[in-house]
UniProtKB/Swiss-Prot annotation:
SUPFAM superfamilies the record matches: Dihydrofolate reductase-like (SSF53597)
Binding site residues for NADP(+): 7, 22-27, 52-55, 73-77
Occurrences of domain DHFR (ranges): 1-193
InterPro entries given in the database record: DHFR-like_dom_sf, DHFR_CS, DHFR_dom
Gene: frd
Reactions that this protein is recorded to catalyse: (6S)-5,6,7,8-tetrahydrofolate + NADP(+) = 7,8-dihydrofolate + NADPH + H(+)
Protein name: Dihydrofolate reductase
Length: 193
């Protein structure tokens, strides 16, 4: 099962143009929102998380209860978390495309002498970056989107394409939750099949 789990914040640029903030350097454009982090943990725990190198490098450390697979150029040094942790497995973009489109792949670890099989029975959460999410959407069984709204402008260095969210909205929404975080922040988590 392939599940997309991500969040974004609709905002405006300094020039007044709409944008969908996704990342800010090696962090989150909206800062730490406790409920968002709790929801993310609940949606990804017990799954194999697949992410790009920059997403992995933005993590403080390996997240407990989840395996980490990083899509990267294997000819370069392996990306690590802020604490210097290696991922459980590293794969190429080609292996990622093979997997999400229905194939099986062998994944190997820099820490272990064995290989393991990743197949369609594996519970996988794709968490970003945008290119990985865009590529996986046509094959995703479930999409979990968190929309974080701030009353003020949110700075970002990585944005989502609006057409990506339009494609998600064409799916059936099966669940939605709204949370008032504080006077300037709301969070809406929606699940699509």
């Amino acid at each position: 099962m392939i599940k997309l789990v991500f969040r974004y914040s609709p905002t405006k640029t300094v020039d007044g143009f709409n944008e969908l903030a996704f990342g800010l350097g090696d962090g989150l454009p909206w800062g730490r929102v406790k409920k968002d982090l709790q929801n993310f943990k609940a949606r990804t725990e017990g799954t194999i998380m697949i992410m790009g190198a920059k997403t992995f490098q933005s993590l403080p450390t390996l997240l407990p209860g989840r395996s980490h697979i990083v899509v990267c150029d294997l000819a370069r040094d392996y990306p690590v978390t802020k604490d210097g942790d290696l991922a459980h497995f590293y794969i190429t973009w080609e292996q990622y495309i093979t997997y999400i489109s229905g194939g099986e792949i062998q994944v190997s670890s820099p820490n272990a002498p064995f290989e393991t099989m990743l197949d369609q029975n594996s519970k996988v959460s794709v968490i970003g970056g945008p290119a990985l999410l865009y590529a996986a959407l046509p094959y995703a069984d479930e999409v979990v989107v968190s929309r974080i709204v701030k009353r003020h402008r949110v700075n970002s260095t990585v944005q989502l394409d609006a057409s990506f969210l339009d494609d998600i909205s064409k799916r059936e929404m099966v669940e939605t939750h709204w949370y008032k975080i504080d006077e300037v922040t709301t969070l809406t988590e929606s699940v699509y099949k």
